[in-house]
Regions:
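Metal-ion/cofactor- or nucleotide/acyl-coenzyme-handling active-site neighborhoods
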Residues: 1-137
Length: 137
């Protein structure tokens, strides 16, 4: 994490109090479930960091969110575009369950007039409108 903090100029957020304390990250309360939480101090984890990132964007007031790398499938036999995580972190074993969570999130976003566009090149997600990143920008 220290090398990421050096190279990445943006904010780093976590739902883990341990990671907050160990790495000096911004912290927000995480709760189990799918969709978008109604409490602005809490995000729903949806069993994956992509779900959490959408929730965090909503907390920050985003009205349009463009998704990249949301494949929700094992594209090319890989569990992640960046390679496997260490064993302790897990490696995308429940992508079908993630898709169900994103479907709930899409419903919540529409109810809040938040546009979410999936600009991922390869994806199993059908719940968000699709576009290329070039067209969406």
């Amino acid at each position: 994490m220290p090398s990421v903090r050096k190279e990445f100029g943006g904010e780093c957020w976590t739902c883990s109090e341990q990671a907050r304390d160990e790495f000096g990250l911004y912290w927000i309360r995480g709760a189990p479930g799918d969709g978008i939480h109604t409490d602005p101090d809490t995000i729903l984890h949806g069993m994956n960091s992509g779900h959490q990132a959408i929730n965090l964007a909503c907390v920050f007031g985003a009205k349009r969110i463009l998704l990249l790398g949301y494949d929700c499938q094992h594209t090319g036999g890989k569990s992640h575009w960046h390679g496997d995580h260490p064993r302790t972190l897990g490696n995308a074993r429940c992508v079908a369950a993630w898709a169900k969570g994103f479907k709930q999130q899409a419903i919540h976003a529409r109810l809040r007039d938040i546009e979410i566009v999936n600009c991922s090149r390869a994806t199993a997600l059908q719940c968000f409108p699709r576009s290329t990143i070039t067209e969406a920008l």
